[in-house]
């Protein structure tokens, strides 16, 4: 089962971002702003930066995740987000044999063709092991491993990149596994920096807040709690009409229920 754990982060990230945002509009230095910065002021400066697209200040807070038991399909999608750092389990040095060979079966295949997928995975494993026993080096034998083979990866992103990552990967149009990873990553960062990630979400949320009045901005929490909430946008950038956007977001998060 997919595991996502936040293992390291900028402890005062919210305050750092707020001070950086304030310093950009002030002649005063860090010490002056830090000593008088209140929690309410931190929230105000973060909110102002996000709702006005002042994204550069978000780069000062950094997060490292350990993401485990995912497929190579998912890890290949992760590394497409280039403003990040990655260290992945090597199948050259960490051979996926015996109990460590746990390829991922997609939920759709579990419902329809689980036996077929398991058979294909077993054949691939048997061929891989045969190649190893015949003397083929690990770096070459791994060529026959399936894309579904399980892997672990350490990922580091700053808050700005996370906002970009979430805008794309929390969307219901994202593939199920990378979407599940994104929702789990969001859960992790919200535990430590709820004010900073209050306004994140798929692109439809970001765009909606750009066209709303500041005192009418919405959050993902509003989507799941207020069933009367209506979007102003006529359609999202993926083409979903206004009346269907909220349902689309709710359906996107349901991927977490499908992988339990």
Curated annotation (Swiss-Prot):
Active-site residue numbers: 169
Note accompanying the cofactor annotation: Binds 4 FAD per tetramer. Each FAD binding site is formed by three monomers.
Cofactor: FAD
Lineage: superkingdom: Archaea
Reactions catalysed, as given in the entry: dUMP + (6R)-5,10-methylene-5,6,7,8-tetrahydrofolate + NADPH + H(+) = dTMP + (6S)-5,6,7,8-tetrahydrofolate + NADP(+)
Pfam families recorded: Thy1
Associated pathway: Pyrimidine metabolism; dTTP biosynthesis
Residue window of motif ThyX motif: 80-90
A biological process term (GO) from this entry: dTMP biosynthetic process
GO molecular function: flavin adenine dinucleotide binding; NADPH binding; thymidylate synthase (FAD) activity; thymidylate synthase activity
EC number(s) given by UniProt: 2.1.1.148
Residues covered by the ThyX domain: 2-203
Residues holding dUMP: 77-80, 88-92, 142, 169
CDD domains, alphabetized: ThyX
Root EC class: transferase
The keyword Hydrolase is annotated on this UniProt entry: no
SUPFAM superfamilies assigned: Thymidylate synthase-complementing protein Thy1
Keywords for this protein: FAD, Flavoprotein, Methyltransferase, NADP, Nucleotide biosynthesis, Transferase
Flavoprotein keyword on record: yes
Binding site for FAD: 56, 80-82, 88, 158-160, 164
InterPro entries xref list: Thymidylate_synthase_ThyX, Thymidylate_synthase_ThyX_sf
Function: Catalyzes the reductive methylation of 2'-deoxyuridine-5'-monophosphate (dUMP) to 2'-deoxythymidine-5'-monophosphate (dTMP) while utilizing 5,10-methylenetetrahydrofolate (mTHF) as the methyl donor, and NADPH and FADH(2) as the reductant.
Similarity comment text for this entry: Belongs to the thymidylate synthase ThyX family.
Subunit note: Homotetramer.
Protein name: Flavin-dependent thymidylate synthase
Species name: Saccharolobus solfataricus (strain ATCC 35092 / DSM 1617 / JCM 11322 / P2) (Sulfolobus solfataricus)
């Amino acid at each position: 089962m997919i595991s996502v754990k936040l293992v390291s982060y900028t402890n005062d990230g919210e305050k750092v971002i707020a001070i950086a945002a304030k310093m950009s509009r002030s002649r005063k230095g860090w010490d002056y702003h830090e000593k008088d910065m209140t929690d309410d002021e931190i929230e105000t400066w973060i909110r102002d930066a996000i709702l006005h697209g002042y994204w550069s200040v978000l780069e000062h807070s950094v997060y490292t995740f350990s993401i485990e038991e995912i497929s190579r399909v998912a890890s290949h999608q992760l590394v497409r987000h280039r403003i990040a750092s990655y260290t992945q389990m090597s199948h050259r040095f960490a051979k996926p044999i015996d109990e460590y060979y746990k390829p991922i079966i997609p939920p759709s295949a579990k419902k329809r063709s689980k036996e077929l997928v398991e058979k294909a995975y077993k054949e691939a494993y048997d061929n891989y092991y045969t190649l190893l026993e015949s003397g083929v080096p690990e770096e070459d034998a791994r060529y026959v491993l399936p894309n579904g083979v399980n892997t672990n990866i350490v990922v580091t992103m700053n808050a700005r990149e996370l906002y970009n990552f979430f805008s794309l990967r929390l969307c219901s149009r994202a593939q199920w596994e990378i979407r599940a990873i994104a929702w789990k990553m969001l859960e992790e960062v919200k535990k430590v920096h709820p004010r900073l990630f209050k306004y994140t979400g798929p692109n439809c949320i970001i765009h909606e807040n750009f066209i709303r009045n500041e005192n009418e901005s919405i959050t993902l929490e509003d989507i799941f709690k207020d069933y009367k909430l209506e979007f102003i946008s006529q359609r999202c950038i993926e083409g979903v009409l206004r009346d269907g956007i909220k349902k689309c977001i709710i359906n996107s998060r349901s991927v977490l229920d499908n992988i339990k």
